[in-house]
Amino acid sequence: MTPAARVKPEDFFTPDEWLLLSSRSSFKGLALLLHCWVLIGLAIATGVVWPITIPLMVMVVGTRQLGLFVLMHDAAHGLLHPNRRINDRAALWFGGSELHIYRPYHLQHHRFVQQSADPDLVLSAPFPISPASLRRKIVRDLTGQTFIKQRFGPLADKMRVPKSNESVWVLIALEVKAQRAFLITNSIGFALFTAAGLWWAWLLMWLLPMATWLPLVSRLRNIAEHALIVENSTDPLRHARTTHTNFFERALIAPYWVNYHGEHHMFTQIPCWNLPKAHWLLASKGITARIEVQGSYAAVLQRVTTEAVL
């Protein structure tokens, strides 16, 4: 299959502009990782001191869990730190233990974006959908059904139709091995919180956000990035969507400039913190008129559901 069309940075930016946009920082990426974990810690502490705030803290922590994924995504492109070893280790230790699995998967997504070989195409292909279908998806996310399906669905499928030479215990052992990083890190977290007498805080303000708010904001991110984007497009400016955000959307849905997805697909060498600058420069040159841009996440959801009922 032919790879997706690409743009040349020099067609859009001066050499000085491109140097500014594509420069990697020894400080900023690591500072963002620290920022993310500090916000998570402050949110959990707030919920412990003022339990009435726990519903809001679930949203804050879930969004920052997505933030860790966003920063791990930058690391998959080698953008978190100019030193590749530091880049990878920082992502593995503090951004997500599945970098080695995610990187080849994600780079294939970029290589064949919105084509049949794109592993993420299944996420955007079903759209448009009806408003009722979207509501059902949101309910599944917020009730933990999506989390359970993603974490335990593959094992359940294998146990339902096992191979003749595989026992249930073998299947369970293989699944535990596949998810050992997730199980180990969360077991350590639970043990530490339990030792501090705060086991309930781990359940309510780490596991619950992971099982509810994180699946929802991850779904909204996927919808905003590629839903209703034309498949097999030869225009590299139309491979993804950028969505403008307000303060509340950045705080509770789209952390660390993940909303500038059109620019990211055009220029994968730009770290996330420079994507707003890239957008501004492109806008000043009239280029954003050629990019799929929506004014808010609500506008995206309205579009992907309205077209289904026309």
Kindly give the residue locations of the regions a language model identified.
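Transmembrane alpha-helical segments that form the membrane-embedded catalytic/substrate-channel core
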Residues: 60-72, 100-102, 145-151, 206-234
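Alpha-helical hydrophobic/aromatic positions enriched in membrane-embedded helices and signal peptides
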Residues: 28, 59, 65-66, 178, ...
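Generic alpha-helical structural context detector
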Residues: 91, 136, 140, 209, ...
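Juxtamembrane helix-capping/reentrant segments at transmembrane boundaries
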Residues: 21, 80-97, 118-133, 233-248
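C-terminal membrane-associated helical module and adjoining short loops/tails
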Residues: 162-225, 229, 234-235, 243-260
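Non-catalytic, topology-defining segments of multipass membrane proteins
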Residues: 1-62, 71, 94-204, 272-310
